[in-house]
């Protein structure tokens, strides 16, 4: 069983940015999180910060340093969790602009045990027409340039992680 932190509502504001941006705060968090995980016999930690640099999908809100600081935070957590045989996982954005702005994909790929890509809500009530919630491929009649597909995302992440 994993303990998850974050989520849409919990990611509002700058608290995660302040955490990852302060090396002492990161160290304290890692120590306290590991103690909590061990005390309650969790198998690991799932990070669901939505999203580094692009707080709740708005890439103008967070500092550019979130990308590097989040990667450092993940590395530091992994270095403590792995020797304890605990998992470190994350839920990440499927949006290209959020990935480019907020994630150091090669570093995250190295330190996360699993990454769950939130490949849903590509389309919804906010669109002026019906679309697949999680399309695998671009439909030729779709005016979207094709970034909003699971197929595009997987190719992008594989290319970035190489």
Short names for language-model regions:
Residues 16-19, 46, 136:
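Generic hydrophobic, helix-prone segments enriched in Leu/Val/Ile
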Residues 1-5, 45-47, 88-90, 115-117:
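Hydrophobic faces of well-ordered beta-strands that scaffold small-molecule active sites
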Residues 52-162:
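Substrate-binding surface in catalytic domains of secreted glycosidases
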Residues 21-39, 96-107, 152-153:
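Short, acidic/polar
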Residues 1-37, 65:
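Glycan-recognition patch characteristic of GH18 chitinases/ENGases
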